[in-house]
Amino acid sequence: MVTYSYDHIHIRSREPMETARYFNNMFGAKILESVQTDGQSRVDIDINGLIVFLAQADTTTPDGPVDPYVGLDHFGLRVDNLDTAAADLKSKGAEFSVEPKDLRPGLRIAFVRAPGDVRIELLERSG
């Protein structure tokens, strides 16, 4: 049987370093600069083991689709206390597209909109 495990998320950005700084400021991501196999520079970030590659988008690259759409919708970050996390992120200027709310018993969620319209779900799971 083949075993699969998480490796990375790859995001194209008009401003990779600006996007990396956003993730550093909001989520404490470590910023790592690297070079892709094609020789292009890339900014990688590490959010507590969640690796995200931020590659420079060409000026001709179209913006992403309007929500909702088929394909990758968002990625989620688990937090111990959603209200505390939301207050912390708001104090740093984060834009919430969905304010903290109860989704079902044992699950509270919120959504943050990062640069490039990347959607990040915050999840507080209990029980």
Where are these regions (language model features)?
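N-terminal beta-strand motif that seeds the catalytic metal site of vicinal oxygen chelate
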Residues: 1-20, 72-77, 123-127
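Vicinal oxygen chelate
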Residues: 1-2, 44, 86-127
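Exposed loop/turn and edge beta-strand positions of beta-sandwich/beta-sheet ligand-binding modules
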Residues: 5, 39-41, 71, 106
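Conserved active-site alpha-helix within GNAT-family acetyltransferase domains
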Residues: 17-26, 110
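Conserved acetyl-CoA-binding loop of GNAT-fold acetyltransferases
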Residues: 25-32, 93-95
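Conserved short beta-strand elements that form part of the metal-binding/catalytic scaffold
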Residues: 30-66, 119-125
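Mid-chain, well-packed structural core segment of small domains
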Residues: 68, 74-89
